[in-house]
């Protein structure tokens, strides 16, 4: 559909500038989410070290899986920033074309970037809105419905490879959990003597509550 196929409330240049502002705003949101997840990851690292000292192998594995999920989430957020940069570059090109041709043009680069961005849950709503506006303006073509579906790889992350879990544990404990790339079935370091390991049943319950709270915080940050 061409730019002037339907009545436009705003001129093309204003539309492009508005889209660029929205993209930059979402990039700041993504940056903030990355920082929040990474801060929480540092807390998880400390918890892994504490659990290793107490000989809590299962807790270590659970926390390592949380770190894997968090790192995958951060990687996706960084990828989304790259796509948003591509869209911003596309917007600059549109302004250049607008000055010469007097109208906006279709852009396969912007189309590809937007197809990826509408799959990112953290920014999905804004990207859908922008996509619809860009379709009306004729910059991108209508996207298939399945491109709007949120990608849920929770199951995949639940089955994180043992090698990756072991690598995380080896990294955090500086090799205290065995030698890389050994499996997580390797014995943990001997528990600390006497007082340190004479934890009461109440302490164990507190540990479980702390673990659940940490998992909940990470899940909230990733969603």
Swiss-Prot record:
GO cellular component, one term: multivesicular body membrane
Stretch list, region Interaction with STAMBP: 196-223, 204-208, 222-223
Impact when changing residue 49 to D: Strongly reduces binding to PtdIns(3,5)P2
InterPro entries, alphabetized: Snf7_fam (IPR005024)
Lipid addition sites, N-myristoyl glycine: 2
UniProt GO MF annotations: molecular function inhibitor activity; phosphatidylcholine binding; phosphatidylinositol-4,5-bisphosphate binding; ubiquitin-specific protease binding
Site (Interaction with STAMBP): 217
Intramolecular interaction with N-terminus, as annotated region: 151-221
Cross-link (Glycyl lysine isopeptide (Lys-Gly) (interchain with G-Cter in ubiquitin)): 179
Superkingdom as given in the UniProt entry: Eukaryota
Record PTM Phosphoserine, positions in chain: 200
Residue window of motif MIT-interacting motif: 201-212
Main location: cytoplasm
Keywords: Cell cycle, Cell division, Coiled coil, Cytoplasm, Endosome, Isopeptide bond, Lipoprotein, Membrane, Myristate, Phosphoprotein, Protein transport, Transport, Ubl conjugation
Region spans: Important for autoinhibitory function: 59-64, 168-169
Acidic residues: compositionally biased ranges: 201-212
Coiled-coil intervals: 22-54, 149-223
Quaternary structure, from the entry: Probable core component of the endosomal sorting required for transport complex III (ESCRT-III). ESCRT-III components are thought to multimerize to form a flat lattice on the perimeter membrane of the endosome. Several assembly forms of ESCRT-III may exist that interact and act sequentially. Forms a metastable monomer in solution; its core structure (without part of the putative autoinhibitory C-terminal acidic region) oligomerizes into a flat lattice via two different dimerization interfaces.
Family listed: Belongs to the SNF7 family.
Protein task: Probable core component of the endosomal sorting required for transport complex III (ESCRT-III) which is involved in multivesicular bodies (MVBs) formation and sorting of endosomal cargo proteins into MVBs. MVBs contain intraluminal vesicles (ILVs) that are generated by invagination and scission from the limiting membrane of the endosome and mostly are delivered to lysosomes enabling degradation of membrane proteins, such as stimulated growth factor receptors, lysosomal enzymes and lipids. The MVB pathway appears to require the sequential function of ESCRT-O, -I,-II and -III complexes.
Entries under PANTHER family matching the protein: CHARGED MULTIVESICULAR BODY PROTEIN
Protein name: Charged multivesicular body protein 3
Organism: Rattus norvegicus
Gene name tied to this protein: Chmp3
């Amino acid at each position: 559909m061409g730019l002037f196929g339907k009545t436009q409330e705003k001129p093309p240049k204003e539309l492009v500038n508005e889209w660029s502002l929205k993209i930059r705003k979402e990039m700041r949101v993504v940056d903030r989410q990355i920082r929040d997840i990474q801060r929480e990851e540092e807390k998880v690292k400390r918890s892994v070290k504490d659990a290793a000292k107490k000989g809590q192998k299962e807790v270590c594995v659970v926390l390592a899986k949380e770190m894997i999920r968090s790192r995958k989430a951060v990687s996706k957020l960084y990828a989304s920033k790259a796509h948003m940069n591509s869209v911003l570059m596309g917007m600059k090109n549109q302004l250049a074309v607008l000055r010469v041709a007097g109208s906006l043009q279709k852009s396969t680069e912007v189309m590809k970037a937007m197809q990826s961005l509408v799959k990112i849950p953290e920014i999905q709503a804004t990207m859908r809105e922008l996509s619809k506006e860009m379709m009306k303006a004729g910059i991108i073509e209508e996207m298939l419905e399945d491109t709007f579906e949120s990608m849920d790889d929770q199951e995949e992350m639940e089955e994180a490879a043992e090698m990756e879990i072991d690598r995380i544990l080896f990294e955090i404990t500086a090799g205290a959990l065995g030698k890389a790339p050994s499996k997580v079935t390797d014995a943990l370091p001997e528990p600390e003597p006497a007082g340190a390991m004479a934890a009461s049943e109440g302490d164990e319950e507190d540990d479980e509550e702390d673990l659940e709270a940490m998992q909940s915080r990470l899940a909230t940050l990733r969603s």
